[in-house]
Amino acid sequence: MKRDIFNIFILFIFWTIIYTSDMGYYIYKFEIDQNDNISLHTSKYVDSKLKPSKLKKHIHSSIVYEIKNNQNYTILKGEIDNPKIIHFEDFANETPSKTEVVLDNAFFVVKIPVDPDMYKIEFYKSDGAYKKLNEIKFINYKNNTEREIFPVTDIMVNGDNSSRVNIVFLGDGYQQNQMHDYISDVQDVSSALFNTAPYSNYINYFNVYAIEVPSEDSGTDHPATAPDCGGYNNDVFYADTYFDSSFDLYNIHRLLYIQDQSAAFDVLADNMPDWDIIFVMVNTPMYGGAGGTFAVFSRHSTSTEIAIHEIGHSFAGLADEYWAGFNYAGEYANMTANNNPETIKWNAWLYDNDIGIYAHSYPGNEWYKPHQNCKMQYLGPPFCSVCVEHTIKSVYEILEPINSYYPENLEVTVPASEIVSFGVDPILNVPNTLSINWFVDNQLVAENNNSIILETSMYSLGEHEVKVVIQDFTDLVRNDL
């Protein structure tokens, strides 16, 4: 008996084809020392699908890695910010400023899909030049099966981790009897973030978790050794905390960061391996923090705004819109050396919502920004339209706008006289601006429906193509991906 064959091709605007695996993935933890030598510390296997990592690089120095087989063929390539570089942004003064610090050593992780051909990883440093650092062979390296499990609180869960951007909080300096304070602090930051556009519009695309890691002592370290401690010179305190956070690092009073990065990665790998964005909240009201591999901030009243500003860097890859220095200058969605209104990258927004071509302050006045009062410049204002647009595009670079589709097989064989159903479960934005249209053999058959039912008797015997196209027609985006 002849049958009709329907091939489903689920096509989405912003779909990105990437290398991945259904066999799980490994989290490899590496250390890079003061001479840029890299060593492998641990590997942990995760039995779930690895989604693409598209977190943006936003500093001038990065580490490029290549996974190769034993024929020296590259099967996977990636790039991360140089983990030794952290930055401190000071919004306490009228004019924000940024200070860069290079750590003596740092830890970082690479999530690698399982591939039986994987043989070695090569590391390169890219900071204007391109220099090979070293290579490490995976052969005979044992997977670390030890786990240290902590409670994980669901702050906001909108779907499976594999189809969401997962924000994970770690707390430092919270004792066991202060975990309710920690969760409350995290909820405050999460609530502030998702009441901020465009995160409020795309809230359903995110999950938020808090790992409850108790410290021996409450608080953090402030040795009062930085020359800029000012009125805090006599305010000396120490605390035995799980991630060893401290002020006064690298002689900057307000530079607050965790010194045991290795422990932080172990906690993440053991308890929430699907993390995409990491926030570390330190239990002190004193102003401070730093950005880098970890976004670290205190319980100061500005912490929520600092966290939202920082996610603009780490998630959306946005530049600061105050002049941070030539180390941070470059071509970004919201920064350019081009001041031609016809060709500038935010041309589609020009002169709407106060979007213009504004020179940075001297000596960076040959670099331009789109707005004069954006959250990437000051704490408090909303993101400008250019930053909103690029944040939305960053969401779609990581995720497809669906939870699931059916049938799961992309090739379906049915008798010529039967009925067959196709459907998708979309991830809706707020307000919903998704359009879901269905096509058979490139002919539109249904508009704005999550599913269709086809009577195969209406089609000739043989092969037909069923296609669903999901598009986001939000007016917050004017430039397609």
Please provide the spans of the model-predicted regions.
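Exposed beta-strand face motif in extracellular beta-rich ectodomains
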Residues: 117-119, 462-467
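Active-site recognition of the HExxH zinc-binding catalytic motif
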Residues: 304-321
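Catalytic zinc-binding patch centered on the HExxH motif and its immediate surroundings
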Residues: 219-222, 261-297
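Short pre-active-site segment immediately N-terminal to the catalytic Zn-binding motif
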Residues: 179-182, 287-308
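Extracellular glycoprotein-like low-complexity segments
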Residues: 21-148
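Solvent-exposed segments in extracellular or luminal domains encompassing
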Residues: 450-463
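Propeptide-to-catalytic entry region of secreted or membrane-anchored zinc metalloproteases
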Residues: 64-86, 144-267
